[in-house]
């Protein structure tokens, strides 16, 4: 199974909810901070909006927001 990519901003308290959930449940994520140009450009190319982070990219799909990301992680990994 491919490692999901989490587009987030490290200081963002909203993003920390998803990061902490994954950490607490031992779910490996490829975390990419959109404050850096590379991840920011990747997210835009996928159709995401850095103002609406976090996003989870998995299987060609882009999942937006804590609730949707946590729901996906729960169904897939727990």
Feature annotation, model-predicted:
Residues 1-29:
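Local sequence-structure signature of Cys/Sec-based thiol-disulfide redox active-site neighborhoods
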Residues 46, 75-78:
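Rhodanese-like catalytic fold shared by cysteine-dependent sulfurtransferases
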Residues 69:
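A basic- and aromatic-enriched beta-loop-alpha substructure that forms the phosphate/nucleotide-
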Residues 45-52:
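Thiol/disulfide oxidoreductase modules built on the thioredoxin-like
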Residues 28-40:
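Thiol-based oxidoreductase modules, predominantly thioredoxin-like and allied folds used
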Residues 54-62:
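A short, hydrophobic beta-strand/beta-hairpin element that forms part of a small beta-sheet core
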């Amino acid at each position: 199974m491919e490692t999901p990519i989490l587009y987030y901003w490290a200081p963002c308290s909203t993003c920390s909810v998803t990061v902490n959930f994954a950490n607490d449940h031992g779910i490996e994520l490829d975390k990419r901070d959109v404050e850096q140009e590379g991840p920011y450009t990747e997210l835009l190319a996928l159709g995401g909006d850095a103002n609406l982070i976090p996003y989870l990219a998995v299987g060609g799909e882009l999942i937006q927001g804590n609730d949707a990301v946590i729901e996906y992680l729960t169904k897939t990994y727990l």
